[in-house]
Amino acid sequence: MTDQSRAQPQTATSTITGIFALLTAKPGVTRERVMAIMPAEIRATVKLYLEGKIREWYAREDGRGAIFLLNAKDVAEASSIMESLPLAHEDMLDHQYIPVGPLMPLGLLLGSPPAKQ
């Protein structure tokens, strides 16, 4: 399930270029349960990548999940993408979403005034 309360707020002045989705196995979910669904999860993930919805993905070093960089305009779109995957259908993962965009202070190098917050 998605925990929207942990999502970072989005401001109207920011430019969102992607959404990080941090997926963590829920407490009590065993490796065996995850591995039983993993072939379908991998196929679905590759399909989303080939459709341009997933830009990058990584395994978490702690072995508890994955981190995706999604081509999504907002958290709602990112959530829709992640909820389409088999492990989400089985309610095995917690999701956290973090919108990201350009490092706005770099505009100072171009002589642009900083965006007002």
Give the ranges of each region predicted by the language model:
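Conserved, structured core segments of small domains
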Residues: 2-117
